[in-house]
Amino acid sequence: MCGITGWVDFKKQLVQEKQTMDRMTDTLSKRGPDDSNVWGEHHVLFGHKRLAVVDIEGGRQPMACTYKGDTYTIIYNGELYNTEDLRKELRARGHQFERTSDTEVLLHSYIEWQEDCVDHLNGIFAFAVWDEKRNLLFAARDRLGVKPFFYTKEGSSFLFGSEIKAILAHPDIKARVDRTGLSEIFGLGPSRTPGTGIFKGIKEIRPAHALTFSKDGLNIWRYWNVESEKHTDSFDDTVANVRSLFQDAVTRQLVSDVPVCTFLSGGLDSSAITAIAAGHFEKEGKAPLHTYSIDYEENDKYFQASAFQPNDDGPWIEKMTEAFGTTHHKCVISQKDLVDHLEEAVLVKDLPGMADVDSSLLWFCREIKKDFVVSLSGECADEIFGGYPWFHTADVESGFPWMRSTEERIKLLSDSWQKKLNLKEYVNAKYEETLAETPLLDGETGVDKARRQLFYLNMLWFMTNLLDRKDRMSMGASLEVRVPFADHRLVEYVWNIPWEMKMHDNREKGILRKALEGILPDDILYRKKSPYPKTHHPEYTKGVSEWLKTIRSQKDSVLHTLLDRKQLDQLLETEGSSFKVPWFGQLMKGPQLIAHLAQIHTWFEAYRIDIDER
């Protein structure tokens, strides 16, 4: 993985602006500590930071290729999982290769198919190509949004980067947030509307979208979406296809020239990846596979079972390591480290995040990076197979199911900002826009229509939020994380499996469990879903409460402008329990909400953000 950034301006000679590009590139050092390079000519500048994973010596970027007299230059963040398939096809079409990297294959894919190259790619990617012949920039982002690509148009300049901080390093870009940005933070955060960058004027290429920037202007289009079709496969064929697609996705994503490990929580998703990876390692003579889990200091003492988290992960992890002979590493984070990483998590993400869910992941990825460069993780299974509790309620309610807190959020704002933002209307509009975009089957109505819309909401919003978190926290540790459940072939197939099949044996993710029979031990196979672990330690609550109290004592804190003083005081007095529902997701409440508000203060202060009230 890497960090990319660039600047295109057809009215300026940019070669003399390389110092600015150096600054923009340097902001992405954590994404690519192994190499750094800047390239430019006339109206374009590219910057690249590299984390070397495949073709260590030959994969330097920006990478240029002259083909039939025309020169093309690429910067690319990601990983292709069909590199050799593409290389073979392109060779048959007359292309020659000097290296073994997927970057060169991607560049030749663009040369051969131009904008249609994205239709041929299996992988996670965000990349930009300067096409000298056509005098334009082409850029694209992977189908599910695993890799980020932010951009802005400022005057005649088009600026972009893997992270917002690269764009903000340009002298013409100021850190501002307007009413729309604040509506995102307080109405929808820590998720955000697909395509928005929160900062005024900064946007993100949506998943499965591409763009060109030329003298004719900016053109953006969607190149992929799930398509709703009648599922005609038998149950047995469906099980076999799910198994085959998933096994192929995992196996393809194990390709690397550097050490690979897996996350392992003992849950269904990470265990499935671990089982297949361990078998592959055994077959290839690379065993044992190394696995990693995270736990919290004194969690055995303070763990609180709930409907969402009925039991601790520990015993399940032990079952997996024994069954597959993995070398397991249990990483235990202290409450101090958990609190201390909260501020840095904001700086890594460029936005307020999911409190300790982010900070623990950042710390965890740094522990893994001490010995590994690449890890596989189980994100996306719940979104595509229907694993979350809100898929299983008696009736599919309206509104974002992971966020039932709009009324409570509104009360937290000061009177003046309640009037300025109109959060309820804003949130509902975003919800309705997504429903209207959902690709439905002809004639689909009632519960079937509502359920398909629910899956689409999860894919576009909740899944991209978790992928966003995983990218930023892992790359903040210079660790590449791959997500086999986000393989677009698997997503396309599962999209049309009827709910009754997905719920085989009346179990959440029942079809996936059936597909994994014979691969996983039965007790792991039928373990109830449990989310990412959280701390219940009173020291964490104390730590974040003291942090927010210190912020409250600062007269110039933006929280005094935005929040209702009585609500803030009550939140601190009750250690977060005055806020009656989770701020976001299943477990983000109490001390997590306190930490999130402190992160909002940190964000405004660290980025010196001005509020544009117009």
Curated annotation (Swiss-Prot):
UniProt-listed Pfam families: Asn_synthase, GATase_7
Catalytic residues, chain numbering: 2
Swiss-Prot/TrEMBL GO biological process terms: L-asparagine biosynthetic process; sporulation resulting in formation of a cellular spore
Binding site for L-glutamine: 50-54, 77-79, 102
E.C. number(s) listed in UniProt: 6.3.5.4
Role description: Asparagine synthetase involved in sporulation.
Site (Important for beta-aspartyl-AMP intermediate formation): 379
Family per record: Belongs to the asparagine synthetase family.
Originating organism: Bacillus subtilis (strain 168)
Protein name according to UniProt: Asparagine synthetase [glutamine-hydrolyzing] 3
Pathway(s) served: Amino-acid biosynthesis; L-asparagine biosynthesis; L-asparagine from L-aspartate (L-Gln route): step 1/1
Positions of ATP binding: 377-378
An MF annotation (GO) of this entry: asparagine synthase (glutamine-hydrolyzing) activity
Keywords annotated in UniProt: Amino-acid biosynthesis, Asparagine biosynthesis, ATP-binding, Glutamine amidotransferase, Ligase, Nucleotide-binding, Sporulation
Domain Glutamine amidotransferase type-2: from-to ranges: 2-216
Signal peptide extent: none
PROSITE patterns assigned: GATASE_TYPE_2
Gene3D superfamilies: Glutamine Phosphoribosylpyrophosphate, subunit 1, domain 1 (3.60.20.10), HUPs (3.40.50.620)
Xref: InterPro entries: Asn_synth_AEB, Asn_synthase, ASN_synthetase/amidase, AsnB_N, GATase_2_dom, Ntn_hydrolases_N, Rossmann-like_a/b/a_fold
